[in-house]
Amino acid sequence: MSGAPEGGRPEDLSRRLAQVRSRISAASHAASSSEPRLIVVTKYFPASDVRILAGLGVSDVGENRGQEAAAKAAELEDLSLAWHFIGQLQSNKARSVVRYARSVHSVDRVSLVTALGKAVAAEQERRAGAGSEPRPDLDCYLQFSLHPDGTADGRGGALPADAAGLAEKVAGTAGLRLAGVMAVAPVDASPDEAFARLLMISASVRAVDPSATGVSAGMSGDLEAAVAAGATHLRIGSDVLGPRPAVG
């Protein structure tokens, strides 16, 4: 049996989170930059872990499985958490995601932008009919492939050449806010070189909207490289939560 001893999960998460925060602080100091925002990716882990993390000061949670994320967000609605959807998103799932997500980090095609815009409009109508507060505009991070040969890969993402057009589509869609860019460093490439490419893409996006300064980059294995490159958001899972539980 793996994981923390019985009754020791809060201590285990506290220790792991402190180690990650220390790495982020050291990397930021080395880069002479402000610390990026930590998004803890809780895919496959229970809502009870998220509640513990919230008690430890975590305010941003990332998920990439829509049904799992929706269930956790509903169970934890008493907490002030910002939910970030970071997985590849089918257009027909947009309506469910905008019910709980503050942002989507995987916007990679015009058809998805259209679907998200319609979903936000429908969600605003639903909330108005229920007498609820309107939701804020949905923050959209444009995901790009950083494959060295300039092609798309299995991790999703638009091609860099499509940056301006995709950014203009988001900027022109009511209910959406162009927040910045996102990418996953290719497994067969230097993260430093990959994130340098992402910064060049970010410049193209900021040419459309100068306020789109977000750079969502860096995971457990390459957060130092991401911080050095100027990431504003880090998506960290296993180094905070430990090995993924077995999934049946």
Predicted feature residues:
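Conserved alpha/beta-domain cores
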Residues: S2-G221, V227-A229, L241-P243
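Divalent-metal-activated hydrolytic enzyme cores
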Residues: T232-H233
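Nucleotide-sugar donor-binding patch of glycosyltransferase catalytic domains
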Residues: V247
